Regions:
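Charge-patterned, long linear interaction tracts outside catalytic cores
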Residues: 122-148
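Gly/Ser/Thr-rich loops at beta-strand to alpha-helix junctions
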Residues: 52-55, 101
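C-terminal structural segments of small proteins and small subunits
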Residues: 88-124
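N-terminal first-folded block
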Residues: 14-49
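Mid-chain, well-packed structural core segment of small domains
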Residues: 68-98
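A short, gly/pro- and small-residue-rich
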Residues: 57-71
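Short, compositionally biased "basic patch" segments
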Residues: 1-16
Length: 148
């Protein structure tokens, strides 16, 4: 058997890998109640709904983010695929709480141009957070060393 046949693996969806990483990092809320509480607390950056989730779930997800700066998208993945990515049976709704992770997730989806509005909003938010981190780091350095 040739080497490439031994090393061949089925294609992996990078977007689902980002969900797995977010779960391990603690930046993911799974299920309707945790997503709702994260959205009400303004912690959810991106609310994600599976393609085969019920219309009621989709309406609830949209109502969670209505009037806020949070984004809501419907994915081309099924509940089973989302569940397998995060280590559950099925997941119909989830929320990413980290804007950089949410942006990387949207960019990894097939046909990311579909989610251009959400990507622009998340990009703006992640840039603002990075700027605040740089300013805080400079402030701490100035407190310690004196302003130059």
């Amino acid at each position: 058997m040739t080497d490439w046949k031994k090393r061949w693996r089925p294609p992996v969806d990078k977007a689902l890998n980002y969900l797995s990483l977010a779960r391990k990092a603690g930046k993911l809320e799974l299920g309707e109640e945790p997503v709702g509480s994260a959205a009400r607390a303004q912690h959810a950056r991106l609310v994600v709904v599976a393609k085969d989730a019920s219309d009621h779930t989709w309406r609830r997800a949209k109502s969670f983010v209505a009037g806020t700066a949070q984004e809501c998208v419907r994915l081309p993945h099924s509940k089973d695929q989302l569940g397998a990515a995060v280590g559950r049976q099925e997941v119909a709704i989830l929320a990413l709480t980290d804007p950089a992770m949410a942006l990387a997730f949207l960019k990894a989806l097939p046909q990311p141009e579909q989610y251009a509005d959400a990507m622009a909003a998340l990009d703006k938010r992640s840039q603002r957070i990075a700027q605040r981190r740089r300013e805080e780091k400079a402030h701490q350095r100035n407190k310690k060393m004196g302003k130059k």
